[in-house]
């Protein structure tokens, strides 16, 4: 049985490890920001707002306006049931849809064996979609493998 003291020590250790990873990422990205290569429709306003969100979080962004997003998603291997309006690549990972910058940072700090992260569809409370004064709507970020297998990565 875990004692309260043991539980508290483990919780403190996990918290310290998480904060250390965030601090390390922040220090490294200050000198060499991670570049997100973003593919989006030239007419999509919410995609441009998401690009602003990730830039504000410290990412460098290279935007490619594309008319045929389905062919881009097919070529990159984005599972059809996870698709959204834009797709990004960062350090070998795919980022599909309105994934929060903090989740991308956590992914890049941990470097798990995944194909990427996705927010399927266009939930109203995600970065780039949220409207000031609108009620928050919970959404889920999922991780996915190349074979399409998914798992909950974060809930917001």
Regions found by a protein language model. Give the residues of each.
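Conserved redox-active cysteine motifs that mediate thiol-disulfide chemistry
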Residues: 41-49
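C-terminal segment of N-terminal export signals and the immediately downstream linker at the start
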Residues: 23-41
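Thiol-based oxidoreductase modules, predominantly thioredoxin-like and allied folds used
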Residues: 61-72, 81-82, 90
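Short active-site oxyanion
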Residues: 35-36, 59-60, 91-94
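Iron-sulfur (Fe-S) cluster-binding segments and ferredoxin-like electron-carrier domains
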Residues: 51-63
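N-terminal secretory signal peptides and thylakoid transit peptides that target proteins
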Residues: 1-15
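Hydrophobic h-region of N-terminal signal peptides that target proteins for export
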Residues: 17-22
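Thiol/selenol-based redox catalytic cores and closely related redox-interacting motifs
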Residues: 75, 81-156
């Amino acid at each position: 049985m875990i004692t309260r003291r043991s539980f508290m020590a483990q919780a403190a250790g996990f918290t310290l490890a998480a904060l250390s990873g965030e601090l390390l990422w922040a220090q490294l990205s200050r000198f060499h920001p991670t570049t997100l290569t973003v593919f989006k429709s030239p007419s999509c306003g919410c995609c441009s707002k998401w690009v602003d969100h990730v830039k504000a979080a410290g990412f460098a962004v290279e935007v490619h306006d594309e008319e045929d997003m389905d062919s881009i998603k097919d070529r990159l291997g984005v599972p059809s049931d996870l698709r959204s309006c834009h797709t990004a690549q960062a350090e070998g990972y795919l980022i599909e849809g309105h994934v929060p910058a903090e989740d991308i940072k956590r992914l890049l700090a941990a470097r798990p064996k995944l194909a990427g992260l996705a927010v399927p569809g266009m939930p109203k409370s995600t970065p780039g979609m949220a409207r000031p004064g609108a009620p928050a709507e919970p959404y889920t970020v999922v991780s996915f493998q190349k074979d399409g297998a998914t798992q909950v990565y974060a809930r917001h």
